Amino acid sequence: MAVRGINKVILVGRLGKDPEVRYIPNGGAVANLQVATSESWRDKQTGEIREQTEWHRVVLFGKLAEVAGEYLRKGAQVYIEGQLRTRSWEDNGITRYVTEILVKTTGTMQMLGRAAGTQTQPEEAQQFSGQPQPESQPEPKKGGAKTKGRERKAAQPEPRQPSEPAYDFDDDIPF
């Protein structure tokens, strides 16, 4: 089997504004996101830390678009997996181009961390994909410290007590 090429983009960044969701004539949802990614380095000549931010246009389709519109807000950190697409159009006789990351039903969007002003714990990241996700099984621990031929059990952290009462949201989840 010959592979003609791979078009895959992975981004981890923050939303610059709330998602813009619209519905196309067939009823499908489309969401536009503006995602900022930053990298920093130390300038070799001056020794000061430099930072460069890139802005990416991300387009989500279907259920992912609906979920993004409902749960993502400006400042939210997201993991995006999609493919690059450049399209063009005519604007008053001038050809315009835009490059976007498309996240179709085979792509992935995962909410990471928490945005400013939210109460979500960082370990409560949620992943959304256009494909059904298998139920995750806890991975068995590998290795570990041994004492005189016996495996030493790690101290189990005490469960955290929630500051607010726990609610059952299973019925309200749209996927």
Swiss-Prot record:
One GO biological process term: DNA replication
Top-level taxon: Bacteria
Keyword Membrane: no
UniProt-listed SUPFAM superfamilies: Nucleic acid-binding proteins
Tagged with keyword DNA damage: yes
Gene3D superfamilies registered for this protein in UniProt: Nucleic acid-binding proteins
UniProt domain SSB: residue ranges: 6-110
Matching InterPro entries: NA-bd_OB-fold, Primosome_PriB/ssb, ssDNA-bd
UniProt xrefs under PROSITE patterns: SSB
GO CC annotations, alphabetized: nucleoid
Motif range (Important for interaction with partner proteins): 170-175
Keywords: DNA damage, DNA recombination, DNA repair, DNA replication, DNA-binding, Plasmid
Low complexity bias spans: 126-136
Renumbered residue ranges of the record's region Disordered: 113-175
A GO term, aspect molecular function: single-stranded DNA binding
The entry's DNA-binding region: 55-61
Self-association and partners: Homotetramer.
Known function: May contribute to the conjugative processing of DNA. It has a functional relationship with Psi (plasmid-mediated sos inhibition) proteins.
Protein name as catalogued: Plasmid-derived single-stranded DNA-binding protein
Lineage: Bacteria, Pseudomonadati, Pseudomonadota, Gammaproteobacteria, Enterobacterales
